[in-house]
């Protein structure tokens, strides 16, 4: 029985949503095709007819997750708001819906070209978003890169440690340090 175009589009969207969630929760290599199809409520055939391979699915799911994250964070009016949301205990606990970069950065270097390219595009998009929220005197791509690297590193560490107090301190210290750093005028020289 053939599936209508509308139903095929719904199936594709469902697979992307579930794959993005599972990849963030378990890693790219920690999720098999069986788990992906079961979570989406579809067959192996529908997955392969839509994407052709797990790598292509991972590439598209990564892009899909980044768009969803970007939409969720787009209502942050200030950089402080963006940092506060990203460095919160709620965000730390939302592995399946949280930061793709913190969830997958350690795995991406071992992936294929397409996945790495998609991840690189995501980094550029987040840097652009962060830069757009920076005060005029601090706006620079390098400053935005430092902010995202700090936040991804902090969230990764906060998720990795088994001590809840230390995890909270990592998030809190990062929020305070970034707030302090970003409230100062940019210096003309690098020290």
Sequence positions of predicted segments:
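Amphipathic, non-transmembrane alpha-helical scaffold segments
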Residues: 8, 62, 116-124
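N-terminal intrinsically disordered/low-complexity leader segments
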Residues: 1-10, 184-191
């Amino acid at each position: 029985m053939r599936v209508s175009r509308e139903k095929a589009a719904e199936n594709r969207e469902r697979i992307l949503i579930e794959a993005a969630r599972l990849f963030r929760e378990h890693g790219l290599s920690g999720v098999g095709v069986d788990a992906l199809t079961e979570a989406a409520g579809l067959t192996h055939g529908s997955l392969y007819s839509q994407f052709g391979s797990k790598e292509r699915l991972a590439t598209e799911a990564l892009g899909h997750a980044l768009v969803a994250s970007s939409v969720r964070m787009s209502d942050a009016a200030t950089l402080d708001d963006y940092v506060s949301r990203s460095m919160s205990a709620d965000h730390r606990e939302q592995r399946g819906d949280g930061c793709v970069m913190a969830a997958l950065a350690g795995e991406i270097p071992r992936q294929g070209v397409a996945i790495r390219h998609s991840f690189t595009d995501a980094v550029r998009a987040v840097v652009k978003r962060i830069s757009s929220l920076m005060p005029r005197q601090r706006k620079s791509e390098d400053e935005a890169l430092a902010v995202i690297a700090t936040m991804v590193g902090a969230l990764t560490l906060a998720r990795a440690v088994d001590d809840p107090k230390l995890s909270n301190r990592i998030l809190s210290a990062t929020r305070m340090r970034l707030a302090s750093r970003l409230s100062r005028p940019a210096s003309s020289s690098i020290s």
